Structure formats: C-alpha cells, structure tokens
Amino acid sequence: MNVQERFDKTIKDCKRVLKVSRKPDKQEYLEFSKIVAIGIAIIGVVGFIIVLIGELIGL
C-alpha cells in the first residue's frame, strides 16, 4: 500500500465517521459537561488530599 492509497483510505474513513456522527443536543451537552466537571473535581480533591497528607507527614 503506497502513500497515496493510505491517504485516500484515511480520507474515506474520516468522511464515513463524519457522515454518521451528529451534533449533540443541549441535554446531552449539559449531561456530558456535568460528568466532566465532576471528574475534574474528583481529580482535584484527590490531588489536594495527597498534598495535604504529604504536608502533614513532612515530605
């Protein structure tokens, strides 16, 4: 498979994905945003707890 064939296949695959995908509606977008915000908050809390424990034991 040469470079041109690989490029054409990649473009064809990208077009197929874009054809079947759709824009999320407002409800889906809000739900996804809430889930992402909760995940970021959890990671932040875990990081804060790790730093707090490190400070308490003197690292």
Swiss-Prot record:
GO molecular function, one term: protein transmembrane transporter activity
Disulfide bonds: none
UniProt GO cellular component terms: plasma membrane
Keyword Protein transport: yes
A biological process term (GO) from this entry: protein secretion
Highest rank taxon of the organism: Archaea
Xref: Pfam families: SecE
Transmembrane segments: 35-55
Gene3D superfamilies recorded: Preprotein translocase SecE subunit
Compartments where located: Cell membrane
Protein family: Belongs to the SecE/SEC61-gamma family.
Function of the protein: Essential subunit of the Sec protein translocation channel SecYEG. Clamps together the 2 halves of SecY. May contact the channel plug during translocation.
Subunit structure: Component of the Sec protein translocase complex. Heterotrimer consisting of SecY (alpha), SecG (beta) and SecE (gamma) subunits. The heterotrimers can form oligomers, although 1 heterotrimer is thought to be able to translocate proteins. Interacts with the ribosome. May interact with SecDF, and other proteins may be involved.
The name this protein goes by in its record: Protein translocase subunit SecE
Organism annotation: Methanobrevibacter smithii (strain ATCC 35061 / DSM 861 / OCM 144 / PS)
